[in-house]
UniProtKB/Swiss-Prot annotation:
Domain of life: Eukaryota
Lineage of the species this protein comes from: Eukaryota, Metazoa, Chordata, Craniata, Vertebrata
Main function: Cytokine with a wide variety of biological functions in immunity, tissue regeneration, and metabolism. Binds to IL6R, then the complex associates to the signaling subunit IL6ST/gp130 to trigger the intracellular IL6-signaling pathway. The interaction with the membrane-bound IL6R and IL6ST stimulates 'classic signaling', whereas the binding of IL6 and soluble IL6R to IL6ST stimulates 'trans-signaling'. Alternatively, 'cluster signaling' occurs when membrane-bound IL6:IL6R complexes on transmitter cells activate IL6ST receptors on neighboring receiver cells.
Protein name: Interleukin-6
Gene name as annotated: IL6
Family stated for the protein in its record: Belongs to the IL-6 superfamily.
Signal peptide per UniProt: 1-29
């Protein structure tokens, strides 16, 4: 009787075993950017590939686009705010020839250092964005979280060659404005500049 029972269920047991192995080997993929949420431990970051880092940057750019779109739905002139850049005196980090991120004179090491330092400088402007943006705060918080994760990944690559700058609360106060149009213009300029900054960094990120 025991022999018959064993022989009858052996194929089922083997099939279940194979199914478990296949499930472990091919996990269900999550949405873009999910791998980077709530996990910035050193061991996790060391396993990050250039492809995953590039995917994270594209995820950040998508969040930037979503915020810009939300603002523009309420303000028809939101994308025509370039002329206010000089007036608002926003000293936003931007790439220059010496930073090694352009095709001409490209230098991966220098570009990674500039990218990391620039993103750290952008933190004060992202704080302004969070304080002034009246739309979906969850999107803004996710943007900030993703950028912090990217900074940690880049710090691993450059082996701590830069330090985190002190928070400039005076600058944050100077950026405040009671004028709704000027406030929205500043937010749009910050988002546009951040997106351009990230696009220039991609060449260094893609290289292994």
């Amino acid at each position: 009787m025991n022999s018959l029972f064993t022989s009858a269920f052996s194929p089922l047991a083997v099939s279940l075993g194979l199914l478990l192995v296949m499930t472990s080997a091919f996990p269900t993929p999550g949405p873009l950017g999910e791998d980077f949420k709530n996990d910035t431990t050193p061991s996790r970051l060391l396993l990050t590939t250039p492809e995953k880092t590039e995917a994270l940057i594209k995820h950040i750019v998508d969040k930037i686009s979503a915020i810009r779109k939300e603002i523009c739905e309420k303000n028809d002139e939101c994308e025509n705010s370039k002329e206010t850049l000089a007036e608002n005196k926003l000293k936003l980090p931007k790439m220059e020839e010496k930073d090694g991120c352009f095709q001409s004179g490209f230098n991966q090491a220098i570009c990674l250092i500039k990218t990391t330092a620039g993103l750290l400088e952008y933190q004060i402007y992202l704080d302004f964005l969070q304080n002034e943006f009246e739309g979906n705060q969850e999107t803004v918080m996710e943007l900030q979280s993703s950028i912090r994760t990217l900074i940690q990944i880049l710090k691993e690559k450059i082996a701590g060659l830069i330090t985190t700058p002190a928070t400039n609360t005076d600058m944050l106060e100077k950026m405040q404005s009671s004028n709704e149009w000027v406030k929205n213009a500043k937010v749009i300029i910050i988002l546009r500049s951040l997106e351009n900054f990230l696009q220039f960094s991609l060449r260094a990120i893609r290289m292994k």
